[in-house]
Amino acid sequence: MEEELSGGKRDPQGLLRINATLGFGRTTIAPLVSEFAERYPSVEVQFEVTDRPVDLVKGAFDMAIRFGELPDSRLSARRIMSNRRFLCASPKYLEKYGSPERVEDLAEHRCIIHRQNDDAYGVWRYVVNDHIEAIKVKGALSSNDGDIVLRWALEGHGILIRSEWDLAKYVQSGRLNLVLPNTVLPSADLYVYYPRQTNQTARARAFIDFLVNRFQAPFTPVDVGIEARGRKKRSSRS
């Protein structure tokens, strides 16, 4: 039911359809949906998690919460969290195989491949002078599940690329070490995407503002001894 806001300000109400990535949606966004529902009991939330991006327009979704860049020119986006990517490995792996000294050395190491959407298999990208470069890596283990590849890295199976959100607590505890920490990788900032339109509903605005507030300081950033680079300063774009 569409909220009727005439005659004074009222709490948001009506149907809100939200999409999110499978693992992150289950572990992080779902509890926030629960908290939002307690605050706004007149909003009916349909929350769907998928392993691939969905067509928000065709699927009649109000928004999607995903890491990475804008996938569709028909959408607008608001960044809700900065999130760098790093190369990492366990002390066990580095003790056995050594640590690469240059990006090119990764081609000779055992790398754990996180297969995402239609990305080229085993191609890792990094930034040099504001240009994207690529290197082909190999390894015995790959998966499309982020939690699985992270577990393999913790168990010493190889070098992995993961986001700061996933790595922070393990780097701080010493269970994972950064590899080539001065290498800049494409970021994995967290965005909420929504169909480009002029009249966004009050319930959608309320949920987006709620997310931004909750992600103000979600974790202690990884300390690499240098100022964070490659982070966009804008909090929203369209």
Give the residues covered by each predicted segment.
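Ligand-binding cleft/hinge of the Venus flytrap
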Residues: 18, 36, 105, 122-136
